[in-house]
Structures are given as structure tokens and as C-alpha cells.
Amino acid sequence: MANLVDTNVLVYCFDPRSPAKQAIACELVRQGLANRQLVLPHQAIVEFVAATTRPRFDLGGAPLLAPQVAYREAEDLLRNFSVLYPDEDVLDTALRGVSTLGLSWFDAHLWAYAEVHGLPEILSEDFEHGRHYGHVRVVDPFLVAANEIHELPPMYDTADPEQDRPPSNHDQNPSSR
């Protein structure tokens, strides 16, 4: 099953300021392209262009990519990956993510793509690694590749839904039967 990729993974492919993350991101994207296991939300492509063309103080005011190069890279992403676009379900789910999960609008929108489209994981360093949001688990590929994380929490076990169910009033008051 495919996983959703956040903007930061795409940007690190072109960011020389962190060679280790650059290598991890490039390999992740290369493998995802080869085995068709990565899906991009349209939001990641829009954010990719904005992030890579923004002037960087620590690069002497230069962007990571010249605008024309960033546009070509964005076109390549569109051609080579499955891209998800927002619809009413994604927007409704994103609103729920903001109100019930406390996510920022952009993070909620990203999560909503995965939740609505049944994608099990989001690959991102911007969420809490290993945390489950609804049916989606977040994986920080940079922590995993750096061996800073040894084990991910298991996905929700649906074999016995009663096991983790909080007690109801009915369970606490046997005389109500």
C-alpha cells in the first residue's frame, strides 16, 4: 500500500544544508518512484515550489532552487507520482483534524488526504513520529534512517475492538440489565 509524502521530504532532496537528510530523502523518493509506493498531495507540490524558491538567509539570500528549476521539478513530480487533489471529503476531514486533533490547518489537510484515501502512513518530520491520527500513522523517515528510532508503535489492532473500548455506564451498573 502507498504512503503519503509531506513537503519536507521533497524539499530535502534539494537542500545541501543537511547532506544526511538530503541522501535519505532522495533515496526515499527514488525507491517510491521505482515501486510506486508514494503518493503526493497537491499541497506538497505547491509548498515545494514556495519552499525551494524562497530566499534563504543562510545561503546568502539565494533560494534552494531557481524558480524555473523548481517549476520543472514540480512538473516532474506531477508526471511521475500519483497526485491527490482536495475534494469535499478531504476538506471536511481536515476541518475535523483542526477541531478534534488540534492540528494546524496545513497539517490537518495533509492528514485528511491520507485518512480519506486509506493511506496508512504519512512520511514527514513535522508530526510526532509514530503517533496515530485516526487511521493514519506518522513516520519520520529521517529518524528511522538515522537509527534514532528502533521500533514503531503497532498500527491499531482491530482483531478485538472490545479490548480497548472504554467502559460504558451499562458495564459499570450491572443492575441496569
Residue ranges: model-predicted function:
Residues 1-40, 55-69, 145-151, 156-176:
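Short, well-structured N-terminal submotif of metal-dependent ribonuclease cores
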Residues 6-8, 47, 107, 126:
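Acidic active-site catalytic centers that drive phospho-/nucleotidyl reactions
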Residues 39-43, 123-124:
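Short beta-strand segments at enzyme active-site cores
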Residues 44-45, 49, 53, 59-78, ...:
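Glycine/small-residue-rich phosphate/adenosyl-binding loop
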Residues 80-123, 157-166, 170-172:
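Active-site neighborhoods of divalent-metal-dependent phosphate/nucleic-acid chemistry enzymes
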Residues 108-150:
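Acidic, metal-binding active-site segment of PIN/NYN-like and related structure-specific nucleases
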